[in-house]
From Swiss-Prot:
PROSITE patterns in the record: VOC (PS51819)
Keywords: Virulence
Pfam family, one: Ble-like_N
Purpose of the protein: Glyoxylase-like domain-containing protein; part of the gene cluster that mediates the biosynthesis of the selective antifungal agent ascochitine, an o-quinone methide that plays a possible protective role against other microbial competitors in nature and is considered to be important for pathogenicity of legume-associated Didymella species. The pathway probably begins with the synthesis of a keto-aldehyde intermediate by the ascochitine non-reducing polyketide synthase pksAC from successive condensations of 4 malonyl-CoA units, presumably with a simple acetyl-CoA starter unit.
Domain VOC residue range list: 6-125
Name the record gives this protein: Glyoxylase-like domain-containing protein
Pathway given in the UniProt record: Mycotoxin biosynthesis
Species lineage: Eukaryota, Fungi, Dikarya, Ascomycota, Pezizomycotina
PANTHER family xref list: GLYOXALASE-RELATED
Superkingdom to which the source organism belongs: Eukaryota
InterPro entries: Anthracycline_SecMetBiosynth, Glyas_Bleomycin-R_OHBP_Dase, Glyoxy/Ble-like_N, VOC
First and last residue of the signal peptide: none
Amino acid sequence: MVLHGQISGIEIPATDVERAAKFYSDTFGWKFQAPANGTIPASKMQTFTAPGDIFPDEGVVSKVEEIPKSGAKFYINVDDLKATIEAVTKNGGKQLSDVISLGPHVPPFQFFHDTEGNTHAICTRPGK
């Protein structure tokens, strides 16, 4: 059942779609493929699914000429911040911050750039 207000999907801008797909696949285990309709090549767009069925539709990595200067950030749950930030840098991303802790009611998180320069964060939820 789709819930009112639930995120339907996300689109990640990329100047190199295949590089971005490889980054997210190698770092987070997301599964990528060319669009099912066969009319758009994988170098221009790839759809993906992420663990946990976080949105009912697929996510999309789409080719752009230039990454927008600002936009939405998404926070990705991970089991281990240290191991994941190491995977981010190993796979071509960039660590932007140390771990940020805002108190007991906010999970620790850390910002990074993907291979395309998009800013996102990883977070961990101990005990969940």
